[in-house]
From Swiss-Prot:
Binding site for ATP: 271-276
Comment on protein domains: Consists of three main regions, an N-terminal coiled-coil domain that binds to protein Pup and functions as a docking station, an interdomain involved in ARC hexamerization, and a C-terminal ATPase domain of the AAA type.
Encoding gene, per UniProt annotation: arc
GO MF, one example: ATP binding
Protein name: Proteasome-associated ATPase
Taxonomic placement: Bacteria, Bacillati, Actinomycetota, Actinomycetes, Acidothermales
């Protein structure tokens, strides 16, 4: 019995053990399966982790963009709110500051009314200047300081009444009293000055330069010096004695009780250097000023008056312009600097009074100039220089001693003077033709001298080809005039320019560079040929005065110039009333 129970217990135990073995085998199999499947799971987890990290990065970037967008939107809202507030503000007005008071208030002129208002703490009351523009808020209080007015009407200053008031002349000779703004506090005012005023406030703000005078004068000192003028050494010495000596040695003139000359007249045929000398005088004076004052750069003023532009159809305007010109000269001379007032073509505006050869406007213009020149007597450093090729037409009262004291005739150049003038334009540094250089041993100086000598001989030779005019005098005498009798510095310069142009054209055609003697010879011929017709249809008397031929009255003129082959016959010149071109 016991053994059966033992067997049953043993069988049960075996079954139990078998079941445990089966479970263990299943567990081992499960573990084996799980062990086999574990690499695939780890890869999947890694992939899921990477995807999660990418999603996190995208969300972070999106979050940053949203934050920036929100900030930008917030800034735009703030700016729009400020813009709305600014547009909703009432308009600001402007006024003119008149003065301040001890209690901190100020007077302003606005809208045609004079008001006493307060000033914003942001504005320094002490910095406000009389006549200055200020900004006003809605309550008409000063909130900002502006600049001075820059537009208005132009009037003429007549008289200074006291420290801050002036009497001015407006349109139609209307007189008005205005206040002077602080912008004019340090500006010296002279009678005739143009002032800018604001008519509503009654303030004068600025002195306006006289444009009408600026158009008539040229203040720049020319760069022409005496070294650039040829053939006029005697005339240059005369004008230097007349102008430079009184300025450089005033004590010697005072010691000898010698009054410096007030003016100089340069007269002579056209193109002989009158204007050139006047320019050189101003340049030389500037250098002398530098030597006297010890300054590196001297200063002188050259008022070149454009004579015909002085004339005006309105009565009294020309005289007023002359007064303004001399007023300018006095202003410049008051600083101790020499001033030259140069009237070119003086006969065009200061003709003899009562001559009947013009509209007789000179009946008032000449006396105005005379009074101005006499007014220069008590004023130092002002010199009047006139230039004319018709000195016989200038009013004698201008030419008398005490006005234009020194009269210098600028003659036509003779052969020696022509060499000097040629040397100013033909220099060794010019391109010279190799053949011409070879003829003179390669010396550039010798070649240039030979060119000048050939040109002068060609111009001044009394040969058949150089005959120009035959003049008949009132007494029946006849005289043959050659081209040399009509030579001038301007003609010499023109001849040299023609020769240089020929040299350039030859270089472009042949490739050989350089100026040649034959270029100068051809230029002389072309210049003479070009002047053949210049004296036609000219009244002989007028022509003689212009050309510098004085003496017996000329009644008949005949041209003698011949063609290149010498076959062209001479022509007579008609004597008619109308004037034409002058040589």
């Amino acid at each position: 019995m016991a053994s059966r129970e033992d067997r049953d217990a043993a069988n049960a135990r075996v079954i139990q053990l078998q079941q445990q073995v089966e479970r263990l085998e299943e567990e081992v199999a499960s573990l084996r399966r799980r062990l086999a499947e574990s690499p695939r799971g780890s890869r999947s987890l890694e992939e899921r982790l990477a995807a999660a990290q990418a999603t996190i990065a995208g969300l972070t970037s999106q979050n940053e963009r949203l934050v920036a967008t929100l900030k930008e939107a917030r800034d735009q809202i703030v700016a729009l709110r400020e813009e709305v507030d600014r547009l909703a503000q009432p308009p600001s007005g402007y006024g003119i500051f008149l003065g301040r008071h001890e209690d901190g208030t100020v007077d302003v002129f606005t809208g045609g009314r004079k008001l006493r208002v307060t000033v914003s703490p942001s504005v320094d009351v002490d910095s406000l200047r009389k006549g200055q523009e200020v900004m006003l808020n809605e309550a008409l209080n000063v909130v900002r300081a502006m600049s001075f007015e820059r537009q208005g009407e132009v009037v003429m200053f007549k008289e200074l009444l006291d420290g801050d008031r002036a009497l001015v002349i407006a349109h139609a000779d209307e007189e008005r009293v205005v206040m002077l703004a602080d912008s004019l506090a340090d500006t010296p005012l002279r009678v005739g000055d143009s002032l800018l005023i604001e008519p509503r406030s009654g303030f004068a703000y600025e002195r306006i330069p006289k444009a009408e005078v600026e158009e008539l004068v040229l203040e720049e000192v020319p760069d022409v010096d005496y070294s650039k003028i040829g053939g006029l050494s005697a005339q240059i010495e005369q004008i230097r004695d007349a102008i430079e000596l009184p300025y450089l040695y005033p004590e010697l003139f005072k010691e000898h009780k010698l009054r410096p000359p007030k003016g100089v007249l340069l007269y002579g045929p056209p193109g002989c250097g009158k204007t050139l000398i006047a320019k050189a005088v101003a340049n030389s004076l500037a250098k002398k000023v530098a030597e006297v004052t010890g300054k590196p750069e001297g200063k002188s003023f050259f008022l070149n008056i454009k004579g015909p532009e002085l004339l005006n159809k309105y009565v009294g305007e020309t005289e007023r312009h002359i007064r303004l010109v001399f007023q300018r000269a006095r202003e410049k001379a008051s600083g101790g600097w020499p001033v030259i007032v140069f009237f070119d073509e003086m006969d065009s505006i200061f003709r003899t009074r009562g001559s009947g050869v013009s509209s007789d406007v000179e009946n008032t213009i000449v006396p105005q100039l005379l009074s101005e020149i006499d007014g220069v007597e008590g004023l130092e450093n002002v010199i009047v220089i006139g230039a004319s090729n018709r000195e016989d037409m200038i009013d004698p009262a201008i030419l008398r001693p005490g006005r234009l004291d020194v009269k210098i005739k600028i003659e036509r150049p003779d052969a020696e003077a022509a060499r000097d003038i040629f040397s100013k334009y033909i220099t060794p540094d010019l391109p010279l033709h190799p053949d011409d250089l070879a003829e003179h041993g390669g010396s550039r100086e010798a070649t240039v001298q030979a060119m000048i000598q050939h040109a002068v001989e060609r111009m001044y030779a009394e040969t058949e080809e150089n005959r120009f005019l035959e003049v008949t005098y009132a007494n029946g005498d006849k005289e043959v005039l050659y081209f040399k009798d009509f030579n001038s510095g301007a003609m010499i310069q023109n001849i040299v320019d023609r020769a240089k142009k020929m040299a350039i054209k030859d270089f472009l055609e042949t490739g050989q560079k350089g100026l040649r003697i034959q270029h100068l010879m051809a230029a002389c011929y072309d210049e003479f040929k070009e002047n053949e017709d210049l004296p036609n249809t000219t009244n002989p008397d007028d022509w003689a005065r212009i050309s510098g031929k004085k003496g017996e009255r000329i009644v008949y003129i005949r041209t003698l110039i011949s063609g290149k082959q010498g076959t062209e016959a001479g022509r007579s010149i008609d004597t008619i009333a109308n004037t034409g071109q002058y040589l």
